[in-house]
Amino acid sequence: YEMLRSLVGSEMCIRDSAYYAQKAGKPDIAADMCTRAEEALAGREKDEYLLLYMGLFIAYYLMTNPERGWEYAERCIDWSLRTNTLKKYRFSCDMVEALKYEMRPEVHLALPEEFPLYRADGVYSVSELGRYFYQQAEELARRYDARNGNSGYMDRLKEIMSN
């Protein structure tokens, strides 16, 4: 609990703390962190720079309130189409993690036509979305790791898949 409280210094940490507290079986702390994060987001729902920090917040909501999680996911998926590759990688990894918590086989989403899996009927297969985000993260990880001469980005993706 104290470790989580020490992380509350920034909005990113508040959002991430909600996810980690929920995953650790601390729903009261998670709910408190979520409330704080929602307050910090008020009036800033269109700030695309937040994409880097929203993935685990989406995961928290897919664990606790899937409809709210998908509201954030719709917005962030749109942002992810026109962001830099680092934010795209991080968001894709976080969506791979988040989608583990969606138990329905299909979801109804309002996604932009530019989204590679766009469907006019708005019905998306959760497993197909998971594959899309995994493949995107994997492709970017391979490029970053080749550039860096190590396996750090793929290691992160493998860790997400193994948890």
Q: Positions of the model-derived regions?
A:
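Structural motif corresponding to the intra-repeat A-B loop/turn of tetratricopeptide repeats
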Residues: 24, 63-64
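C-terminal non-catalytic interaction modules
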Residues: 81-163
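TPR-repeat structural position
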Residues: 27, 66-67
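Alpha-helical junction/boundary sensor with strong preference for TPR arrays
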Residues: 5, 34-45, 79-83, 141-148
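TPR repeat positional signature
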Residues: 14, 54, 92-95
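Residue-level signature for tetratricopeptide repeat
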Residues: 19-20, 59-61
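Single conserved hydrophobic/aromatic residue that forms the stacking wall/gate
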Residues: 1-14
